[in-house]
């Protein structure tokens, strides 16, 4: 999921403004987004958060993601990829990449072990995605943004209740915050 989107956008201020403009009226002064990079640190690592009334609800940090990469590396080394069966080194790399993507999607997304790059990737993706696709996305960060979006009305919130309640707690909390703000 991680993509180096940091090099593809002009400024965080512009993205933040666009995201704030998409917040529903009930959440305008409650929800805030934070993102920073530490330019003096190797690879300009950073930190991103989504806050509600100045309380940090979820954080995306390179430190957490680094621990994830270590775990994935250990799993990949213990995964038997049959080199002879796949035929070429590029096929082996492709299979390892596929295994890594499966690990990331299945384990790390539900546990919210994501980095600042995942957050920026999700923001830039969200701004290009229609609201229906975001509400049904496998990317939980896109769903979080969609739950707080002004384009999602009360009827839609009621329709997606069962789906939202089956999601991990860190995602569900944003659905509940929106419903509470709307009086549902």
Model-derived segments and their meaning:
Residues 1-184:
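Alpha-helical scaffold segments
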